[in-house]
Amino acid sequence: MSDEAAVVANGSMSAAKAAPRTTVPNAKTTEPTLTGVRVTAVGERPERLREAGSGSERGPAATIAACVRDGLLHPGQVAADAGTRIAAADRKDNVFSVLRAEQAMAESVGLMERADLDVLPMAGVPVAVEHGTPIAGEPAPWGPAATTDHPVVARLRAAGAVVLGHVAAPELGRWSTSAGTERVIRNPWNPARNAGSAAAAAVAAGLVPVAHGSDGLGAVRVAAACCGVFGIKPGQHTVPDVGAWAGSVENGVLATSVDDAALALSVLAARPDLAEVDPPGRLRIGLAVDPPSPLLRVDRHWTAAARRAASVAAAAGHLVEPAALPYGNAVFAAFLRWLALSARDVPALPEPDQLSRRTRRRLALGRAVQRFRLAHPAQIDRVEARLLEFFERYDVVITPTLAAPPPMARAWHFRDRPATLLAGARLAPFTPLWNLVGWPAASVPMGMHPRSDTPVAAQFAGSPGSESTLLRLSAQMEARCPWQRTAP
């Protein structure tokens, strides 16, 4: 989209390189390859593997893991199938910036040798990680190759997931870049529209059942809403983080189903209870469809998405009533904080001089915010105090996730800055509040927009520690109002 995407979606209007870099280790294997050729490994049961060849290798993630644990699927078969789909898709939609083709196959072989295979929650599940999140041995965007895995990657591997590579993300994950050899990621539902992020596009296109995403001002939820997948941003410190951006973004999950997202989040948070998504007890739910400012207009189909979610919740037995969220100046405060944190963290980068001129200009603005103390903790304290009072009456609040359909898939950042900033404010005014206070929020698909031919969605948000409640309510929505797992 534009520089604006940094404001509303932590750079979610993503761009990718013209061709993903494929890394190849020295080791060779006779296990399944990305060409689709496979050799049955010792100890496999060929007849059972054939029984599983009916699409189980494409997900959902929980099905893949169960089949791998039970010996119905070889994880190499799953990785090979995913690699084939990615290779075909990246000929026209460059979603992956780094595809770890041979490494993924080698890791799949190693997975079969693990003594704990039968208890791994994500055994053999292919996953994508957002660019900028270190994978050991892979180049960092702004410095040398990473020497260790980010905690997110380490936990995914420990749970048996196979990390296929990095999906593309803008510089510093902060804004759209679509110049030169880069191009905007297109929406799998309507290629004329933006996808919101490469991670969401990868999930919606069926390349992977689960992807990691970073959410600084709504990126995971904005992109999930654009692409019709489920996305959740956990509360602050639920998932560990390290490095320059620790504290300014949360590591979230995008998936084709709530079950899969809950499974992945339970792994990232080291909380097995989050994978349990039985219906919640009777909840008090507020429906808040008004935008943070009367100057902002909300597309009626996005308002209808929130109202539909509220109706489904009421039919499920929850107490639902109209409500007014106490936004105050939260969106503006979130923007100022985002600028200040970005400028604060840049010196920690290994090679900050590699940043683009445009990024350096924006970081200079962040330093000005710091210098004049325009972003300070008291702003957050005031907003949080009002929200705590609001949530004395409610367990969950429902809003539209976005206020408009995804923007057109073009190089928005070439447009003049006021135009892009205005577009950003119009797109996603509902998401930044929850980043400012560090509370959990999720985006739940709720149908299609009749004019843009892209999905619409509702946002569910709750107080600190309500991740399980949001997941359970979202799963209940999915059961009563199911959505198509991937784009046609």
List PLM regions with ranges.
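Intrinsically disordered, low-complexity segments enriched in small polar residues
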Residues: 2, 11-14, 36
